Swiss-Prot record:
This is Type-4 uracil-DNA glycosylase. SUPFAM superfamilies: Uracil-DNA glycosylase-like. It comes from Thermus thermophilus (strain ATCC 27634 / DSM 579 / HB8). [4Fe-4S] cluster binds at C13, C16, C84, C100. The lineage of its organism: Bacteria, Thermotogati, Deinococcota, Deinococci, Thermales. GO terms for biological process: DNA repair. The gene is udg.
Amino acid sequence: MTLELLQAQAQNCTACRLMEGRTRVVFGEGNPDAKLMIVGEGPGEEEDKTGRPFVGKAGQLLNRILEAAGIPREEVYITNIVKCRPPQNRAPLPDEAKICTDKWLLKQIELIAPQIIVPLGAVAAEFFLGEKVSITKVRGKWYEWHGIKVFPMFHPAYLLRNPSRAPGSPKHLTWLDIQEVKRALDALPPKERRPVKAVSQEPLF
C-alpha cells in the first residue's frame, strides 16, 4: 500500500453520510515522508471546492504561522479528522470521526510515520488523547500516542475569531506553541523509514 493508492481509494468513499454533500474528497497533502503531521477537524467550503486541505482563510493563517516559525509547509503533511466537508461547517460527529479515522487517517499515519503530530482544535485533539477535552487546557503540552509525540494547538479558525495579539491571547499562545514545535523538530535526528506500531483497525491491503 502506498499513500497515492490510499488517496485514490478515498476518492470514492461512501462510508458515512458526509459523502452526500461533498464536492471533493480532501484527503491531505504534503511531504509523504514528513516528520511533522498537522491534523485539523474537517474541510471547509474552499477545501471542498479544491480538494486541498487548509486553503481558505484558516489555511492562509496556518501558512503564516508555519512561515513565521520557519517551518516550510511543503515539508509538513496536512490532513483532517474527516475527509469530507460537514454540513454548514459544523464539527464532525463522533460516528463520522470514528469511521473516517479508522478507514483513512490511521493508515495515513502508518504510511507517513511522522515523529510529531499537531492536532488543531478540540475534535482533533480528542482523537489523539482518547477523551473529551477542552483545547484551552490541553494545548501547548506534549503527549504521546502510539510512540508519536503529540502537541495540540488552537485551530486557526478559532484564531480568526480571536484576533488579539495581547499577551495571553490565543494568538500569542499559538506563537509560543509553534516555536515549541519548531524546537522539537530541530532536535529530531534525520528521519529513517522504520516500521511503526500498527494503529489501524483494518489490514493495509
